[in-house]
């Protein structure tokens, strides 16, 4: 199997280095990752500027672009051979619930799905400085082995969150749904050395929907959460209501 690996923390991040090392023992891998941290880039593509790609060594590239740029370039002509699937990560921190809307890690996996490949986004869910990357990398290998035995459909995206624990403390796997958070904390207002006002995006909101069955709950209890996600954002259950509502619009 041939795997494309990307991330949003940058090509030198510990997570992607460990992921490539572990997956490289069981598959052929190519790493194409941003040259710097692009956390929170979501699905953004670079459209107004050229994108420079710098080979570092065979099958390893740093890209002056977003995580989505990396996967898009790789799968639309930069690589001579098409990979079989995409792995994105290992992210330094969780991508639980609403986090997936902003995550460059998840976006890289989504771009793989857009371009016809099954994809896995994997994150190490702990503090702002997680340490057990080898645990998450071993989880990735386990998932790849299962995929090889029982392949995923091409439209599959798995969002995987691994507790920041030693391998022998992981309780197993749970298939989960996305939970959600409360509204984000207020923006942080400060002043620069010249007295000008500057702003920082505040912390994410606390857990709201985080009960049994959610990704939050699984990780909190020591399980690896595996959430199938999709790119169709249509709220199908609301279509009839909107049709009826539109009947009241005068033309």
From Swiss-Prot:
Give the enzyme's EC designation. Answer: 3.1.3.5
**What are its cofactors?**
a divalent metal cation
- Bound cofactor: record note: Binds 1 divalent metal cation per subunit.
Query: Which of UniProt's keywords are assigned here?
Result: Cytoplasm, Hydrolase, Metal-binding, Nucleotide-binding
Localisation per UniProt entry:
Cytoplasm
What Gene Ontology molecular-function terms does this entry list? 3'-nucleotidase activity; 5'-nucleotidase activity; exopolyphosphatase activity; metal ion binding; nucleotide binding
| Pfam families, per the entry | SurE
Q: What is its main location?
A: cytoplasm
Q: Indicate the family of this protein.
A: Belongs to the SurE nucleotidase family.
State the function annotated in the UniProt record: Nucleotidase that shows phosphatase activity on nucleoside 5'-monophosphates.
The name this protein carries in UniProt is 5'-nucleotidase SurE
Q: Which organism is it from?
A: Halorhodospira halophila (strain DSM 244 / SL1) (Ectothiorhodospira halophila (strain DSM 244 / SL1))
Primary gene name: surE
